[in-house]
Amino acid sequence: YPDRVVIGTNNSKKISPILKKLYDPIIKKGAKFIVVSRKAAELIKYAANAFLATKITFINEIANLCEKTGINVDDIAEGIGTDQRIGSRFLRAGPAYGGSCFPKDTKALAKTSDDFKVNLSLVKNVIRSNGNRNNLIAQKILKIAKQNHLKKIGFLGVTFKANTDDMRDSSSLFIIPKLLKNNLKISYYEPTGSKSVLSKYKKIKYCINQKELITNCDFVIIHSDWDEFKNIDFNKVSKNKKLSICDLRNLYHPDEFKNKKIKYYSIGRPFHG
């Protein structure tokens, strides 16, 4: 159940008792019932999602620094996330945020601020940094591919997160076209079986399972954090002697690839390979 139920109404005396009765089952479980004006409810929604987007963007920028300094971003996330004033949620370094809410709501909040001539520079910089994130990830993949002479790239997952078929503003939609422009062969496996959005790219191959993808690639990109991607025995599945992995979700620990022929790259952590 949610932490709170926010009701936006300009007639709270009439509406509040009705809706409080409707939401009573989850209120009894601890959800807070908040009644505000319609404008306030809208701003609560935008501000909440902008704040979460800011946390994601912050840890992604810290991950950039960690990669240059040889520090493990997971240690940083744990160190600051255990502070109850901050909290550990949304402090996982990875691709740019996407989906149906964060991109839309941050932009709506920025547009609203412009309409009222208020400069929300923080929110605008979050939007800008998140857009740059897609370019940075694409360049990271291209650099690894060039260094290791890799041509066949396979994406494990293309949705913006696990347990959904939602492709809206998924970082894969920004990264894959950049890879195609560099004459790399792209394939992908998506647990939902979704093909619709990427089907317009005739050069992209859809694989029916993770095994087909891994056996036909020399460079695997772990893009979405599906549970089925968390315990793959890459040595067993792939016979490729120069297999490289770029784990955009940090699903594996770098130590798992010590003394193995696989080159393992992740986000904001030391390289092992």
For each predicted feature, which ranges?
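Structural/interface elements that position substrates and couple domains in central-metabolism enzymes
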Residues: 1-273
